[in-house]
Amino acid sequence: MGNMVETVFAKSSGAGVSAICVIRISGPDALKTINTLLKSDLKSPPRYAVLRTLWWGKVKLDQALIIYFAKDSSFTGEETVEIHLHGSKAIIDMTFNALNSFENIRPAGPGDFTLQALKNGKLNLSQVEGLANLINAETEAQKILADKLFSGNFNETVECWRSKLLNIKANIEASIDF
């Protein structure tokens, strides 16, 4: 990814066929991309769901719920749009083909949204690890531990330990000097 912020997209809902599929677009061209698929400006306040028709040229993709998140209120710290479509394979494939046709947008790789959040200061490293553990948790105990990391409490604990160790170090150095 380098230093340039890219616009990325991915299916954010679970794998397989379902009633609803959520596709997330995040980056500087997210709003421009959705406006092109809508054939007009979204004109929706952030964090409100609106029902709109998506188009790829003259082909109707689907009627979908669209939610826009401004940079300051998104998970990634980038402009983000969530598209809630019907979950059929045909609709998902057609929508992905449409998104792939844009020049300044690419499919997200594993962890790309989290990387955006880390780079934008929305998450720290321990929260990133906690999120990965939360996503992969198979037991209740794993989930509880992952929640603690993800909540950021671990970072506060480490900072407290660091502060105490620095005080101990200073006291030892002072006692050696005298």
Model-found features: residue ranges?
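Flexible nucleotide-interacting loop at or near the entrance of a catalytic core
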Residues: 140-178
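A glycine-rich (often HGG/GG-containing) alpha/beta subdomain
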Residues: 1-144, 148, 152
